[in-house]
Amino acid sequence: LFSAPSQTGKSTQAALWAQHRGAEVLNGDKAAVRLDGAPTVHGVPFSGTSGICRNVSMPLRCIVLLSQAPENRIRRLGASEALALLPQNAFADASVREEWQRTLSLLLDLISAAPVYALACTPDVRAVETLEHALVRDGF
C-alpha cells in the first residue's frame, strides 16, 4: 500500500509495479484498510486523478510512505516513527477528539499488523528494484 500526499507519485509507483512486476492496482489515489482478521486493502469507488478504482480486495503486506528523491533510499520504520508519519495520510478531523483518538488507535493496530517503510524514490524502475530488494530481504 503506497501512502503519500497528493502529487508525490503513488500512481506512478503503482504503474511501475504493474508494468515491471505484474502488480494489480486497486486505486490510484485512496484505499480502505480492514484490520479485523488478516489485514486487507480494499479498492474504493473514488479514483481521484488516476481514474483507477477497482472493487477488489487483497491482503495488506506492507505500507510504503513515499517521497520524491534524486536517488532511491528505503528504510523500515519503527512503530513510533511510523505512528508519527502515518496520520498525515489518514482521514480524520483532528478537531473532533473522539474521531482523532479512534484514528490513532486504528493506526496503532495498522502498524502492528503490517511493516511500514519509507521510500524516497525516483519515478522509474529503480524504485521498484529498491523496494523489492528490501521486501525480499525482510521476508516479504
Locate predicted features.
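Post-Walker A alpha-helix
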Residues: 13-14
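Glycine-rich, often acidic-flanked micro-motifs
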Residues: 1-4, 18-140
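Conserved lysine of the Walker
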Residues: 10
